[in-house]
């Protein structure tokens, strides 16, 4: 991870990050987050089946996840939610519930399950060096395949499959959209397209952009120092010469937004841009056949 990206993730007001992230998948989050931001969105579980689940990866590892879906319904469109660098904490769970309230089955796998607990690291640098950098892309993408399979066995319609991801998960969303032709669409929130290559991260999304399998909506902040605007211009150029299905990809850059402008639990949150991006996300999934708002069987 590049230094500007690490810097962009450090909040500019004091709060106990470990305590905050420790509230993963639903316990104790609201009390600690409200001291950070009164703007934080809390979505209830009324009418939903929501909570922690687990499933086996291809290598037999048990992968924990958070899922939310309308109670008692099947044949649901599926959204895979890829977590930020901080792992599956309550903000990511809340995003799943927001999708579920609109009729989706949304599931967020813990893609750090083998390497460790993101809440245990007291600094961004330690989190990156001791956990995130040790997570191989190939493993992550395989675990997302397993997540998709689980969703198909638990009420999801895999003919209506989308993916979205934030920050670290935005980069992973790019890579998965370059991998899985069965996706209908993807939405990337401030996911970088270039970065340092390592044995665990051998390719950047830009390197594979000519193989993009689905249309992607990219949502970025112009003030995000971790994502150079010229890298987005390069990405657009490569996509324009790639498969026809991907040429409809769109990039939206918000002039006054920093990194993590959707993260309503952090000082980086920009309400107007976040709401616009969310509306665009829902429209994107509708337009590309993930949802037509006429879905779901059962009461």
Specify the residue positions occupied by each region the protein language model found.
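Short beta-strand element of the alpha/beta-hydrolase
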Residues: 75-84
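N-terminal export leaders
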Residues: 15-29
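C-terminal catalytic histidine-bearing segment of alpha/beta-hydrolase fold enzymes
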Residues: 245-299
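Primarily recognizes the serine-hydrolase "nucleophile elbow" in alpha/beta-hydrolase
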Residues: 146-208
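N-terminal secretory signal peptides
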Residues: 1-15
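N-terminal cap/lid segment of alpha/beta-hydrolase-fold proteins
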Residues: 39-71
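Short beta-strand/loop motif that positions the catalytic acidic residue
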Residues: 212, 218-220
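Gly/Ser-rich "nucleophile elbow"/oxyanion-hole loop immediately N-terminal to the catalytic nucleophile
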Residues: 122-164
């Amino acid at each position: 991870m590049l230094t500007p990206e690490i810097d962009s993730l450090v909040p500019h007001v004091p709060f106990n990050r470990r305590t905050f992230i420790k509230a993963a998948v639903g316990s104790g989050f609201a009390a600690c987050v409200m001291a950070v931001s009164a703007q934080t969105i809390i979505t209830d579980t009324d009418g939903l089946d929501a909570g922690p689940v687990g499933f086996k990866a291809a290598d037999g590892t048990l992968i924990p996840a958070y899922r939310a879906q309308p109670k008692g319904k099947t044949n649901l469109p599926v959204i895979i939610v890829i977590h930020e660098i901080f792992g599956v904490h309550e903000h990511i769970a809340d995003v799943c519930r927001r999708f579920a309230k609109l009729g989706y089955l949304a599931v967020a796998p813990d893609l750090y399950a083998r390497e460790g607990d993101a809440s245990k690291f007291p600094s961004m640098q330690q989190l990156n060096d001791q956990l995130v950098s040790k997570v191989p892309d190939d493993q992550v993408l395989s675990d997302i395949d397993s997540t998709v399979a689980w969703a198909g066995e638990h009420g999801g319609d895999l003919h209506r499959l989308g993916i979205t991801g934030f920050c670290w998960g935005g980069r992973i969303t790019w890579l998965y959209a370059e991998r899985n032709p069965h996706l209908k669409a993807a939405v990337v929130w401030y996911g970088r397209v270039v970065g340092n290559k390592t044995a665990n991260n051998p390719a950047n999304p830009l390197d594979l952009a000519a193989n993009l399998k689905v249309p992607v909506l990219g949502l970025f902040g112009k003030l995000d120092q971790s994502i150079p605007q010229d890298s987005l211009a390069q990405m657009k150029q490569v996509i324009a010469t790639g498969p026809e299905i991907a040429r409809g990809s769109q990039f939206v850059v918000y002039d006054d937004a920093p990194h993590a402008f959707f993260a309503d639990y952090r000082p980086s949150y920009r309400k107007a841009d976040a709401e616009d991006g969310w509306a665009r996300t829902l429209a994107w999934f509708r337009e590309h056949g993930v949802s037509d708002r006429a879905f779901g069987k059962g009461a």
